[in-house]
A protein has these predicted regions:
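Hydrophobic residues at beta-strand termini and immediately following loops
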Residues: 46, 69, 183-185
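Short substrate-entry loop that stabilizes the transition state in hydrolases
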Residues: 53, 75-76
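N-terminal post-signal-peptidase region of extra-cytosolic proteins
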Residues: 29-31, 78-81
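Short, acidic Gly/Pro/Ser/Thr-rich loop/turn segments
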Residues: 51-53, 190
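Alpha-helical cap/lid subdomain in secreted, periplasmic
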Residues: 59-65, 74, 80-218
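Active-site metal-binding loops of divalent metal-dependent hydrolases
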Residues: 49, 71, 101
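N-terminal secretory targeting modules
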Residues: 1-46, 53-56, 61, 90, ...
């Protein structure tokens, strides 16, 4: 029997019933290699499909060892549950996080403006509590956080575009409160109307293609 040092100490958060479950086994296996072999990680990118699809290892290779922990469909309140496993135990110098757009899809089911307003307020509370918890965990682990704005969208209802503006104001305010850098992708990717993503930067109005990612790199 071959003994692997520290394998029994690996944090495996389990399944939450969200999209993250689809990559949980993969990330546990990848995390075990980094954790047990004490690979020095410089940056972890945490987020949803926009992070998942981004070739961050190539874009940021000059900064050292870069790890992508993006999951398609990720939401803010589930990112909290895997932060210890996918960020803290990897001991990166920096964590770059962008998450929140997927919390908004539930708004499509609202039948009245009053119902949507109530649900928007609930989502804002989720953002607030989730970001605060992640920032607290990062501070305790002495990991520098870079918090990114939610990117703009195209071909989506107007209410979602306006809600993203509101969400980003909260995220920016939390960054200021906690003295954490706020990375403003939003304003860099806007069309001339000031609220919609520049159509030429995205495949589908949500996910950037190379043009969008090149802007995000800068």
């Amino acid at each position: 029997m071959i003994y692997i040092e520290n394998l029994e100490c690996l944090i495996k958060p389990g399944l939450f019933g969200g999209q993250g479950d689809l990559r949980r086994t993969e990330f546990d296996i990848r995390n075990s290699q980094i954790f047990c072999n004490k690979i020095p990680v410089d940056i972890v990118f945490l987020g949803d499909s926009i992070t998942h699809f981004w070739e961050v290892e190539e874009y940021f290779k000059e900064y050292g060892i870069v790890v992508n922990r993006g999951i398609g469909g990720e939401v803010a309140h589930l990112a909290v549950k895997r932060f210890q496993a996918d960020v803290v135990q990897l001991s990166p110098k920096i964590c770059v996080m962008m998450v929140g757009i997927n919390n908004t899809w539930i708004l499509d089911g609202c039948k009245t403006e009053a119902e949507r307003t109530s649900l928007e307020n609930e989502i804002m509370e989720i953002y607030d509590s989730s970001y605060r918890e992640i920032l607290a965990q990062a501070k305790a682990a002495e990991i520098k956080m870079l918090i990114c704005s939610i990117t703009p969208i195209h071909h989506q209802p107007e209410f979602r575009k306006h809600f993203i503006v509101r969400a980003n104001k909260l995220i920016q305010a939390l960054c200021e409160e906690h003295e954490v850098p706020y990375v403003d992708y939003y304003s860099k990717m806007l069309a001339s109307d000031g609220i919609t993503m520049e159509e030429s930067l995205s495949w589908d109005g949500v996910h950037p293609h190379v043009g969008g990612y090149n802007i995000m790199k800068t």
